[in-house]
Design a protein with these regions (language model features):
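Surface-exposed, low-hydrophobicity beta-strand/loop segments enriched in small/polar/acidic residues
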Residues: 2-151
């Protein structure tokens, strides 16, 4: 029976140093809570949620917990450069996740996390959500959490 090696074990066997974000790093938690005001947020409005440090591998365990919202409302969760504000991936963590009926949903279908991809930040990034499809309801609450691996 044949055995193959992961990218990390192959690199270690060849004498290369593997970064903590790829092997043996510390898992840390990202947490953001947002309570919308008395008015709605329009389609394409953004919510700045917080920062991830340089060298952070974004894990695939992100979730959003939310109170009842408007029918058809969805959000994207992405990241942009902290230094320049330039969007790196508008839906890198999650794309078109429904936040309508109160509940919880996974935020792991983003373009930087699916199809065998992973993402390690090359600079400090801002994590943000974009309102899609319908307005975010007045007084709606979102709690977003997920982990990343670093040092």
């Amino acid at each position: 029976m044949a055995e193959v090696k992961s990218t990390q074990t192959t690199a270690i066997a060849a004498g290369y140093k593997v970064l903590p974000s790829a092997d043996g790093g510390r898992r840390r938690m990202f947490f953001a809570e947002y309570l919308n005001g008395a008015s709605t947020l329009a389609i394409a409005d953004t919510i700045y949620l917080g920062d991830l440090p340089k060298g952070a591998r974004i894990c695939k365990d992100w979730v959003v917990s939310f109170s009842a919202g408007t029918a058809s409302c969805t959000i994207d969760v992405g990241f942009r450069s902290k230094a320049t504000g330039t969007v790196i991936d508008v839906d890198g963590i999650a794309a078109l996740v429904a936040v309508t009926t109160a509940g919880q949903s996974g935020l792991n279908n983003g373009s930087s996390l699916t199809a065998g991809l992973s993402y390690v930040t090359t600079e400090v990034v801002e994590v943000y959500a974009t309102v899609r499809a319908a307005v975010l309801a007045a007084n709606q609450k979102l709690i977003i959490e997920g982990s990343y691996v670093q040092d």
